Amino acid sequence: MSNVYDILKERGYIKQLTHEEEIRELLGKEKISFYIGFDPTADSLHVGHFLQMMVMAHMQKAGHRPIALVGGGTGMIGDPTGKTDMRKMMTKEQIEHNCNCFKKQLAKIIDFSEDKAIMVNNADWLLNLNYIEFLREIGVHFSVNKMLTAECFKSRLEKGLSFLEFNYMLMQGYDFLELNRKYNCVMELGGDDQWSNILAGVDLIRRKESKSAYGMTFTLLTNSEGKKMGKTESGALWLDPEKTSPYEFYQYWRNVADADVEKCLRLITFLPMDEVRRLSSLEGAEINEAKKVLAFEVTKLIHGEEEAQKAKIAAEALFGGNAKDLGNMPTAYIDKNDLNNLLVDLLVKCEILPSKSEARRLIKQGGLYLNDEKVTDMNLVVTEEHVTEDGIMIRRGKKNFNRIVVE
């Protein structure tokens, strides 16, 4: 069996490592436990997390055990990494609900049976800590001077960094130590924005336990312009079908830029690299075939083959004019009494767009269509005349479609 390190390297996941040669040898010779942390600030994971799930799945296929750590304790503080403002604190009930949602989504590609993977909540140990003991046992190993040079704190120093958030690095380092002691977890993985926090945990274990510990970060999922992927006009691209429908999810990947196809095939599908290279080499109109494969494969992983097939059929029906298959498109249902209202109000009511200001912005940019006619009037009223045999068709941009059916 190939060393999973080589697989991760070839597919382009790895960004930084603490001990490259040691890690390669370790992953090739032993079966280890490793962990990735998830911040439970929403009740669904999104595309940014999906890349982490893929790394976990590759590692598990090679015989290593993933530990999904949900930050029920640290989530009550908030990770300052990449943030310019302090985030709202969450209740225990919110965090517990979100943890349960995460496990269902992770289980789509991670096998949790027979302890092949486990999920833990750091609230189990962080919420019961004795502050004085924590400072004496853990705090003594952290240099404030060194912490202030970490990227995750730099951007916050000018605006103000609370002592609450300053503790986050200690908490995350302690998580790694706790997992090392309980589960013999020897490696922490995370996005490259977590590098400083990961180093803190590796260093803490080496100091406290006199044992080897390792860290690895992977690239963030960005497009060819360096912007994070997974953002739509409606917000984040969620893995929960109630938040982002399988059709919208499929369409997002079907419409990625040509320059991003190869990267996405490598990072968020399990297609063999020979097939990735073949699809990525297609040019001109043929690249659309690669995009269809990408969209189908990613949707299948998250929503299952049946939903992926439905999304594919709906997309083809839309462009091929096959109305009977439009039922798989994101559809909102309204009452006749909802007619004779402003289009911008209707779009928000049907959750097609998050706000009226967003709808007006889209109209101003010339990117909103009603029954395939460009909308130019901010005060357009939707009447019975707009209701076709297939309903009211809404298009955002070139390829994002929604349907409103009047019941």
From Swiss-Prot:
It is an enzyme of class 6 (ligase). Gene3D superfamilies: HUPs (3.40.50.620), RNA-binding S4 domain (3.10.290.10), Tyrosyl-Transfer RNA Synthetase (1.10.240.10). Its EC number is 6.1.1.1. GO terms for cellular component: cytoplasm. GO terms for molecular function: ATP binding; RNA binding; tryptophan-tRNA ligase activity; tyrosine-tRNA ligase activity. L-tyrosine binds at Y35, Y168, Q172. Signal peptide: none annotated. A motif ('KMSKS' region) lies at residues 228-232. Keywords: Aminoacyl-tRNA synthetase, ATP-binding, Cytoplasm, Ligase, Nucleotide-binding, Protein biosynthesis, RNA-binding. Catalyzes the attachment of tyrosine to tRNA(Tyr) in a two-step reaction: tyrosine is first activated by ATP to form Tyr-AMP and then transferred to the acceptor end of tRNA(Tyr). Homodimer. Belongs to the class-I aminoacyl-tRNA synthetase family. TyrS type 1 subfamily. This is Tyrosine--tRNA ligase. It comes from Clostridium botulinum (strain Hall / ATCC 3502 / NCTC 13319 / Type A). The gene is tyrS.
